[in-house]
């Protein structure tokens, strides 16, 4: 991995370049140029410069890119190509770790006799992750396994990347429409220590594998062995959801059934896991999911999970029920009493109604077709500073226990839009979110 100082030097070049472009753009406007055209040109060039530099980074930037990947569907068409190119670079495979380093990490983590635990070990990496790479191997009992090995120095490099990226949240947000960058980076930073210790991921994965053991629609590979910087799990062969998204763009007519099934399964997995496992899978990006040949959805990364031992909070279901029935006066009272309104701020139920309506389409029908155009429209309204609803949004907040829930919900919806899929959203809500059915019946 590159040294942190090299990363910081590259990132330090960005503000000067963007500031220079802004000055030129301001001068052109003073000279009578078209404001919209000049602003679009400025944003395009700023985006290209920012993405070009971030695309060279790994670690924190790669994790950041994975988090942003679910927002791709919300980006306006004029930014779509540079945004997708940037995501490709941010998530691209890192240069492979020298095999001597891989063996050294295995010596340190599994003991110098680690080779006796494997019948065979492929020295060529099968895949790369943000802080490590995966090798295919055969365990001593004959099982095919995936061996995830953390890059030496990944912890220091990741912390350095995230510290620098956190200083750039405003700049990044200005060229990525619809992306609420600051909380994304805050979450990644907060969970860095957990994700750097693969024993935490192993514990999460064991819980999910137990909860979904024998499930007809989902499969979680079992953990075979674990250490702080090495994780060995069962190997699964399947088609990544990221590949299905791409295939759907190339052949929309021939993939409708598959895309709808994938989106429905991902929705069911995220909605059901707090009840089944007591945890929420908190890293919803397409690279963490695969469709197997038998039609089951496989989930293969559990580095980020949020504990929900009692399932989703019933208040969530109550809020959705009130929004469905447009009982915004009661919803506003509920939001005040449970900390969704910043203390000292005043919001009317009419303002809440106007603010929430663009987001409530998926809960108005039994089944909803998520598309890029819908996501773009919603994101556009949410970030249009000329709209009074944006001012309303500035008076709202997410209580800490809801931050990860809404992050996962937003990520799942983003993937559904990328899949251009129809999902029985309300049925999932009724089946798995407590408070929804009861509150509607009570109302």
Task: Tell where the protein language model's regions lie, with residue ranges.
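Short amphipathic alpha-helical recognition elements used for nucleic-acid or partner binding
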Residues: 315-318
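Catalytic-loop of the protein kinase fold
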Residues: 276-286
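Broad phosphate/nucleotide-binding scaffolds in NTP-utilizing and phosphate-metabolizing enzymes
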Residues: 1-273, 278, 291-298, 302-310, ...
């Amino acid at each position: 991995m590159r040294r942190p100082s090299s990363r910081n030097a590259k990132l330090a070049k960005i503000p000067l370049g963007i500031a220079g472009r802004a000055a030129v753009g301001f001068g052109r406007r003073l000279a009578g140029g078209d404001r919209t055209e000049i602003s679009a040109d400025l944003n395009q060039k700023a985006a290209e410069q920012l993405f070009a530099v971030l695309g060279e980074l790994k670690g924190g930037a790669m994790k950041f890119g994975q988090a942003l990947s679910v927002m791709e569907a919300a980006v306006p068409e004029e930014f779509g190509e540079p945004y997708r190119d940037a995501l490709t670079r941010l998530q691209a495979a890192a240069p492979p770790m020298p095999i001597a380093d891989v063996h050294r990490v295995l010596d340190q983590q599994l003991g110098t006799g680690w080779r006796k635990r494997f019948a065979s070990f492929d020295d060529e990496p099968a895949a790369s992750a943000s802080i490590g790479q995966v090798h295919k191997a055969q365990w001593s009992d004959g099982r095919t396994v995936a061996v995830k090995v953390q890059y030496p120095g990944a912890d220091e490099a990741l912390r350095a990347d995230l510290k620098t990226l956190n200083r750039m949240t405003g700049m990044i947000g200005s060229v990525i429409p619809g992306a609420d960058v600051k909380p994304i980076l805050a979450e990644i930073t907060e969970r860095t220590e957990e994700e750097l210790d693969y024993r935490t991921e192993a514990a999460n994965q064991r819980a999910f594998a137990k909860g979904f053991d024998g499930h007809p629609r989902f499969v979680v590979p079992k953990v075979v062995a674990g250490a702080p910087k090495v994780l060995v799990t069962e190997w699964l062969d399947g088609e990544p959801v990221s590949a299905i998204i791409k295939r759907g763009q190339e052949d929309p007519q021939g993939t409708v059934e598959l895309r709808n099934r994938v989106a429905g399964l991902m929705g069911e997995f995220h909605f059901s896991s707090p009840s089944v496992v007591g945890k929420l899978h908190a890293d919803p990006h397409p690279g963490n999911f695969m469709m197997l040949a038998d039609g089951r959805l496989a989930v293969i990364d559990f580095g980020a999970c949020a504990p929900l031992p009692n399932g989703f909070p019933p208040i969530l279901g109550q809020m959705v029920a009130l929004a469905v029935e447009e009982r915004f006066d009661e919803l506003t009272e509920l939001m005040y009493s449970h900390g969704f309104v910043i203390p000292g701020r005043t919001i009317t139920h009419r303002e809440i109604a106007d603010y929430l309506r663009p987001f409530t389409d998926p809960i108005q029908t039994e089944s909803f077709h998520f598309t890029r155009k819908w996501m773009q429209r919603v994101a556009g309204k949410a970030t249009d500073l000329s709209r009074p609803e944006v001012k309303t949004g500035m008076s709202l907040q997410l209580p800490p226990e809801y931050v990860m829930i809404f992050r996962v919900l937003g990520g799942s919806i983003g993937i559904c839009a990328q899949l251009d899929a129809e999902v029985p959203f309300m049925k999932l809500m009724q089946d798995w979110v407590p408070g929804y059915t009861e509150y509607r019946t009570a109302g």
